[in-house]
Amino acid sequence: MSSASYQDFGWTSEGAANGESGVGLAQTLIKRVTRLENVTRICDLGCGNGYITGRLAALGFDIIGIDASESGLQIARQQYPQAGFIKSFIEQTIELPEAGTFDLVISSDVIEHLYKPAQLLEAARFLLRPNGQLLLGAPYHGYLKNLALALTGKLDSHFTVLHDGGHIKFFSVKILSELITAHGFSDLQFSYYGRAPWLWKNMICHGRKND
């Protein structure tokens, strides 16, 4: 999302986004990070209030969180002083001196909020060292889940069309894979979180930057 179209709806809590569900997703993502090889330096792209960033810093990772939200970053800096935080819009990340130095870029529940989701992949690629890794989390959508929402009459509430802010894009595995590979990543592997198979709440994609 560009600076021209961004609106900060405000962070008011140090907790994970989306309550208990967000805690579970954050824990799942953190476990994935700890299992990756050759990862020391991490960028959390769209870090919000720093919930994930701070926990990875506590585990000993050299991590920087980037976000456009002043309210989120204020909480992050107060709660997690051991991590570094930078205010930047996604399209401005190419101006950061840290570009090209990260072993891993993570981004959890960010891409679905962007008018131009390709910018997130471009930023991740620019921030990563050659052959660096990407972990990207997003809400899962697929045929069976969408059908279940329609049959149970929950489509309107699910897509939150009357809310200020919220999700702008809705990704299936196929579409998210196409977007990620189109921007210079390969070896994609998906894992899932929440609910029964094919009705998953979230998906996490791991990929590697092409040299």
Give each language-model segment a name.
Residues 1-100, 104, 120-121, 136-141, ...:
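Conserved N-terminal segment of class I S-adenosyl-L-methionine
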Residues 10-12, 151-162:
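Short glycine/proline- and charge-enriched loop/turn segments
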Residues 71, 115-119, 146:
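Short N-terminal helix/helix-N-cap motif within the alpha/beta-hydrolase-1
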Residues 104-110:
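A short beta-strand submotif of the Rossmann-like class I SAM-dependent methyltransferase core
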Residues 112-115, 171:
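Residue-level signal for the nucleotide or nucleotide-sugar donor/cofactor binding architecture
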Residues 121-130:
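A short glycine-rich, Lys/Arg-flanked "PGG" loop and its adjoining helix->strand segment in the class I
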Residues 135-157:
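Conserved class I S-adenosyl-L-methionine
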